[in-house]
């Protein structure tokens, strides 16, 4: 049974909003000391950020003069976007951190007036100043056909094991944590029933997408259910929480919309829900124990086809494609159009 977690060692995060007023009174200079930012510093910074966000007031935050703020892949000034509209954090907030890269992330849920949404936040901290802020916010309001899945923010809870530390003797290396996450994305791309990159799952590994439950992850992959994914590109593993055994990434899943009917590996005939070019932008985390992915959580938002984040350093331009190749539509003729005119306003011969 999954319950809302409240761990004593997470007191700084879970109490962050209850002490929001006190946080907002903390001078920015007190947070902006010249030394580096360790794990507790990063997670405290995230708690301060959440409090400032809910107060619609970034002034107490130690923001870099060169701060970049991106929400749903669009670069904005801060405050703007949901900084202006958030009315409540439903939570519970799940915080992860990576002192080696100065990154801290939060998975939570919010209300904007009466509109619920799932929110993933990424902060980059250098010299105890926030230099980058990134949000992915998914709500029912911004869904269009085919919709990204979305669950109920009031009843959703995180898998409590995601936040638990892994015993030191059982911890995986950064490279191994990233390799499992990358194997997942490689399996999701052109999904044909094969597991790629050495990725491994428990029989009951479950994925939550915008709070909606998708159980038996490996079974879905073995069936080739996600064959419509042409590419999973611009994968950026920006945060590895080695203490908790979690790798987190940003990526984009491209759908060209050419695949129509296809067969699962068990022979079941099905049809792709993607009928035109579009992409999904995602922030996704993977809990890994002993080289096995045990839990997955993601926040998705629909984007224009082949969109990328302003933070993407080296954009991918690979062709992608499905195996076997999809037959392109038959050639057709142009529809009727208005007459072509010359400079005198007369119909031109053509």
Where are these regions (language model features)?
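Bacterial N-terminal signal peptides that target proteins for export
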Residues: 2-18
